[in-house]
UniProtKB/Swiss-Prot annotation:
Gene3D superfamilies: DNA helicase RuvA subunit, C-terminal domain, Elongation factor Ts, dimerisation domain. This is Elongation factor Ts, mitochondrial. GO terms for cellular component: cilium; cytoplasm; mitochondrion. It holds the Pfam family EF_TS. Belongs to the EF-Ts family. Keywords: Elongation factor, Mitochondrion, Protein biosynthesis. It comes from the Eukaryota. This protein may be expected to contain an N-terminal transit peptide but none has been predicted. GO terms for molecular function: translation elongation factor activity. GO terms for biological process: mitochondrial translational elongation. It is found in: Mitochondrion. Associates with the EF-Tu.GDP complex and induces the exchange of GDP to GTP. It remains bound to the aminoacyl-tRNA.EF-Tu.GTP complex up to the GTP hydrolysis stage on the ribosome. InterPro entries: EF-Ts_dimer_sf (IPR036402), Transl_elong_EFTs/EF1B (IPR001816), Transl_elong_EFTs/EF1B_dimer (IPR014039), UBA-like_sf (IPR009060).
Length: 276
């Protein structure tokens, strides 16, 4: 019985059979072919043990690369399931633009987005009260996924920052949140620039289409460098309607906006307090 068990883990003499094992291990771990081959030889063909070997090596590589400079990447839009859960923009970095465009990097961005949204929902938005602590917590929760990504990409990858959208306290009833992402590689909510907006619904129980909210987010992305009162600017794509008029016609009031372009400081607009 012991002989049969060991035989199951022996490296196949047939090269074709061995390469099938390598192919399977690479599919499961996304590690380089050379690493998969070496791990299988080291463990006599034991697939589970080979995965453990790759995991340890990936962790070691991640530690070595952990201090390397990360100057490229993408920003990610994270919107909770309810306005009370909040919204934020996460910046995720790599060492090169080539790695940031990699499918695995983009997939980890989506995983980070999903994880932060879960945390926002579970804490009713409280996790965003301290952005620096939120980065640490999110990095800890995503530690294994980040280690694997570093091993696959051969570069450092990290969550750099979280910028929360903060609605104006005096315009916070019946809130709706809109999001717009620019410069995406066909991955939802992951791009070069993200715009978030908080809007207050004037008429209760009226359904506001998602594309209306997205349009407001797009406006602030397109005009993020503009100076002056945002309410008096022409709404993006319109030559006759100002932002204030466009929102009023749709039963909305502006509360706040947040635009984050990768590598730049966030641009924030907040509704002014009414004159007393």
């Amino acid at each position: 019985m012991l002989h049969r068990s060991l035989a199951c883990f022996a490296v196949p003499a047939d090269r074709k059979a061995f390469m099938e094992l390598v192919k399977t291990l690479r599919y499961r771990t996304e590690a380089p072919i050379s690493d998969c081959s070496a791990a299988l030889k080291e463990t006599d063909g034991d697939m589970d043990a080979a995965m453990q070997v790759l995991r340890k090596r990936g962790a070691a590589r991640a530690m070595k690369k952990g201090d390397r400079v990360t100057e490229h990447g993408f920003v990610v839009s994270c919107v909770g399931s309810t306005p009370q859960s909040g919204a934020a923009i996460v910046t995720i970095c790599s060492e090169t633009d080539f790695a940031a465009r990699n499918e695995h990097f983009q997939r980890v961005c989506m995983q980070v987005r999903d994880q932060l949204c879960k945390l926002m929902d579970a804490t009713n938005g409280a996790v965003l009260a301290n952005p620096e602590e939120a980065v640490k917590h999110l990095s800890d929760v995503m530690a294994e996924e980040l280690r694997v990504a570093i091993a696959v990409l051969g570069e450092n990858m990290r969550v750099r920052s979280i910028a929360p959208l903060v609605p104006a306290p005096h315009v916070s009833e019946r809130l709706l949140i809109g999001s717009y992402t620019h410069g995406s590689l066909n991955v939802d909510n992951v791009g070069r620039i993200v715009g978030l907006v908080a809007l207050s619904q004037v008429r209760e129980n009226e359904v506001v289409p998602k594309d209306v909210l997205t349009s407001v987010g797009r406006h602030f992305v397109a005009t993020s460098g503009a100076e002056g009162n945002y309410a008096h600017q022409n709404f993006f794509g319109s030559e006759t309607e100002t932002v204030g008029k466009w929102l009023k016609q749709r039963g909305l009031k502006f509360s706040s906006s947040l635009v984050q372009e990768f590598g730049k400081e966030p641009v924030v607009h907040t509704a002014p307090e009414p004159h007393r």
